[in-house]
Amino acid sequence: MTNKTWGGRFKKSLDSGVNQFNASLSFDHVLFDQDINGSQVHVKQLAKQKILTEVESQAIYSALEEIRSEIKQGQYSFNVRDEEDIHMFIEQLLIQKIGDLGKKLHTGRSRNDQVALDLRLYTRDKGCLINELLTRLIDCLDDLTSKHQQDLMPGYTHLQQAQPVTLGAYFNAYQCMFGRDKSRLEDWFKRMNYSPLGAGALAGSTLPLDREWVAESLGFAGIIPNTLDAVSDRDFVIELCSVAAMIMMHLSRLCEDLILWSTQEFNFVILDDAFATGSSLMPNKKNPDVPELIRGKSGRVYGHLMAILTVMKGLPLAYNKDMQEDKEGLFDTINTIIACLQMITPFLQSLTFNTLLMKTKAQSGYLDATAILESLVMKGMPFRDAHHQVGAWIAEAIEKQCSLNELLKGG
C-alpha cells in the first residue's frame, strides 16, 4: 500500500520520477481559490443532505478558509512534493489541521468533477476580467472615433494609398472588431456557465447529492446533465482560447498599423516617451516595443489553441490524464491576453497623431480617383469606360507630375 490517497490497491510506492512527471501542483496551484470555493459549497451540501453533520461541515468549511488565507499570505511553496496537484495539496493541509474529519471532504466527489468545476470557475472569473478590459478598450476607441471623426487620412489596400477616410472611421473599424469579440466572449459565457460537480468520476454517485443546489450556490445557470460529458468536456477551454486568439489577432493588426505609422516614413504617430524604448547602441532610436510585443504574443496564444485542440482530438470518453495538458496553455493564454489588454488602452491614450500630415497625404496623390470615376458614372458614362478614362488621366498626371484636379482644370 502506498501513501497516496488512491493507494489502497497498490503494493509499491510510486516511482519518484513518475511522481514528478505526474504532478501538476507547480502550475495548477493558481486554482486554489476556486478549489476552496467549490469544496466549501460541497461540504455545505453534504450537511444539507445529512451526509455530514452541521458541526462537521462547519469545521471543514472554517479550516478551508484558514488554508485560503495562509496560501494568500504565501505560507506554502508549490514545488513538486508528495501531493500531485492543488486538490490533494489542500486536502492534505485540511487533514493536518482537523485530523480524520478532513478525510470526509472528498465524500461524493472525484477529482474528475472537482477539476472540471475548478476550471469552469477559474475561466468564468478570468472571462469576466477579460470582458471588463475589452469594454475599456472599446470605450477608448469610441473616444478616439469621436475625437477624430473629421480628421482626413489616406485609406489603404495592399498597403497602397486607396481612398480618403477619416482617422475616426479607422478607430471605429477596430471598435467594431472588438465589439464582436466581446459578443463572442459573452456567448461563450452562456454555454460554459453550467456545473459539472456531482458527476463523480464519470457516472455520478449513489449518495443523495443535490447537484442543482450546488450549481445555484456557485452561481451557475444549471447543471451539466450528462455525467460523462460533465467530466470529459473541455469545449469551454477551447472556446475561450479561440476567442482569445481572435482578440489577439485584432490587437496584432491594430499594433501593426501603429508600428508602421510611427516610422519616419509614415510619421502619422508620435510615441509617448513613457511607452517607448531606446537602443543600447543607437541614440537616435525610439522603438515601439509595446505594440511589437503585443503583435508577437499573438503567436503564443495561437499555439496554445492548437495544442489543446490536438490534445483533445483523440481522447475516448471520459476523463484521461492527457487532459492535465489543458491547463498550462490555458493559464498562459489568459495571462497573456489580460496583460495585452491592460497595456493597449493606456498606450492608445498616450499617442499623438499627426493629423495635419495625414490630411495632406489624403488630399495629395490620386486618392480622389474613385470619386471622379463615380461622378462620370452619374453623368451616364458606363462604369468600365469611366474606369478606363480616369486610369488614363492618372497616367498622364503622373507623367506631368501633377494632381488629377490640376490636370483636369488645365484641360
Curated annotation (Swiss-Prot):
<dbReference type="InterPro" id="IPR024083">
    <property type="entry name" value="Fumarase/histidase_N"/>
</dbReference>
<dbReference type="InterPro" id="IPR022761">
    <property type="entry name" value="Fumarate_lyase_N"/>
</dbReference>
<dbReference type="GO" id="GO:0005829">
    <property type="term" value="C:cytosol"/>
</dbReference>
<dbReference type="InterPro" id="IPR029419">
    <property type="entry name" value="Arg_succ_lyase_C"/>
</dbReference>
<comment type="pathway">
    <text>Amino-acid biosynthesis; L-arginine biosynthesis; L-arginine from L-ornithine and carbamoyl phosphate: step 3/3.</text>
</comment>
<dbReference type="InterPro" id="IPR009049">
    <property type="entry name" value="Argininosuccinate_lyase"/>
</dbReference>
<comment type="similarity">
    <text>Belongs to the lyase 1 family. Argininosuccinate lyase subfamily.</text>
</comment>
<protein>
    <recommendedName>
        <fullName>Argininosuccinate lyase</fullName>
        <ecNumber>4.3.2.1</ecNumber>
    </recommendedName>
</protein>
<dbReference type="GO" id="GO:0042450">
    <property type="term" value="P:arginine biosynthetic process via ornithine"/>
</dbReference>
<dbReference type="InterPro" id="IPR020557">
    <property type="entry name" value="Fumarate_lyase_CS"/>
</dbReference>
<dbReference type="InterPro" id="IPR000362">
    <property type="entry name" value="Fumarate_lyase_fam"/>
</dbReference>
<keyword id="KW-0055">Arginine biosynthesis</keyword>
<keyword id="KW-0456">Lyase</keyword>
<keyword id="KW-0028">Amino-acid biosynthesis</keyword>
<dbReference type="GO" id="GO:0004056">
    <property type="term" value="F:argininosuccinate lyase activity"/>
</dbReference>
<dbReference type="Pfam" id="PF14698">
    <property type="entry name" value="ASL_C2"/>
</dbReference>
<dbReference type="GO" id="GO:0006526">
    <property type="term" value="P:L-arginine biosynthetic process"/>
</dbReference>
<keyword id="KW-0963">Cytoplasm</keyword>
<dbReference type="InterPro" id="IPR008948">
    <property type="entry name" value="L-Aspartase-like"/>
</dbReference>
<dbReference type="Pfam" id="PF00206">
    <property type="entry name" value="Lyase_1"/>
</dbReference>
